Amino acid sequence: MSEGDSNKTHFGYKTVEADKKADLVASVFHSVAAKYDIMNDVMSFGIHRFWKRFTIETAAARPGMKVLDLAGGTGDLTAKFSHLVGERGQVVLADINDSMLKVGRTKLRDKGIVNNVSYVQANAEALPFPDNHFDIITIAFGLRNVTDKDAALRSMLRVLKPGGKLLVLEFSKPQHEMMRKAYDLYSFKILPKMGEIITKDADSYEYLAESIRMHPDQDTLKEMMQTAGFEQVDYTNMTDGIVALHKGYKF
């Protein structure tokens, strides 16, 4: 099923009306928002911090830059970017889900991160920002939840400055058969049980496992970014490709 040319799309393994997916995804994140950070640590054994640190290092944000942390959720990347861009810079934490935004805003304010961060509820497919506005855009573990990924990539390209870079951190396809088998066992047997114990919501973590399997693999996403207009697109696999960081530029 191709992106953007059908009235149907995937919600995990289910086929749903395209205009219903956003609401279904929203219900997932409304349910898990309060325990989102805890679950990230538990289900990744803390490795998500390494993946995000590598993303920050690759972004190479400098003082005075404008950064969009799209699908930024509870603000892990925003907190780091806020320090790097300094008082002359700006970080926008954007998320389509208001529950996630509230958790992120509260967490960052409790850490004293207030002066150079703003919060916007936004749909990645139609970003409410001017053309050529941001130096860096990141979207971490969010693209797979977007209904029309092609439209979202084009929207990101539009608001990125010439010379700017997009970083897409997302679950992807393990490179070795033994890892794939172990990952499938973990994802479909263990992860939902963790979700039930910690968040009282196994279904949302079943969706997580399914949505990862339905997301474009490394080379397909690279092609999608190139088709959207990004240049010098490449990717780095982490943890045998369980996660990949894609990078592309606007020239």
UniProtKB/Swiss-Prot annotation:
Molecular functions per Gene Ontology: 2-methoxy-6-polyprenyl-1,4-benzoquinol methyltransferase activity; demethylmenaquinone methyltransferase activity
Top-tier EC class: transferase
Pfam families: Ubie_methyltran
Any one GO BP annotation for this protein: menaquinone biosynthetic process
Record CDD domains: AdoMet_MTases
Binding, S-adenosyl-L-methionine: T74, D95, N123, A124
Pathway in which this enzyme or protein is active: Quinol/quinone metabolism; menaquinone biosynthesis; menaquinol from 1,4-dihydroxy-2-naphthoate: step 2/2; Cofactor biosynthesis; ubiquinone biosynthesis
InterPro entries registered for this protein in UniProt: SAM-dependent_MTases_sf (IPR029063), UbiE/COQ5_MeTrFase (IPR004033), UbiE/COQ5_MeTrFase_CS (IPR023576)
Superkingdom of this protein's organism: Bacteria
Membrane-spanning residues: none
Enzyme Commission code: 2.1.1.163, 2.1.1.201
Keyword annotations from UniProtKB, A to Z: Menaquinone biosynthesis, Methyltransferase, S-adenosyl-L-methionine, Transferase, Ubiquinone biosynthesis
Catalyses which reaction(s): a 2-demethylmenaquinol + S-adenosyl-L-methionine = a menaquinol + S-adenosyl-L-homocysteine + H(+); a 2-methoxy-6-(all-trans-polyprenyl)benzene-1,4-diol + S-adenosyl-L-methionine = a 5-methoxy-2-methyl-3-(all-trans-polyprenyl)benzene-1,4-diol + S-adenosyl-L-homocysteine + H(+)
PANTHER family: 2-METHOXY-6-POLYPRENYL-1,4-BENZOQUINOL METHYLASE, MITOCHONDRIAL, METHYLTRANSFERASE
Similarity annotation: Belongs to the class I-like SAM-binding methyltransferase superfamily. MenG/UbiE family.
Annotated function: Methyltransferase required for the conversion of demethylmenaquinol (DMKH2) to menaquinol (MKH2) and the conversion of 2-polyprenyl-6-methoxy-1,4-benzoquinol (DDMQH2) to 2-polyprenyl-3-methyl-6-methoxy-1,4-benzoquinol (DMQH2).
Protein name per Swiss-Prot or TrEMBL: Ubiquinone/menaquinone biosynthesis C-methyltransferase UbiE
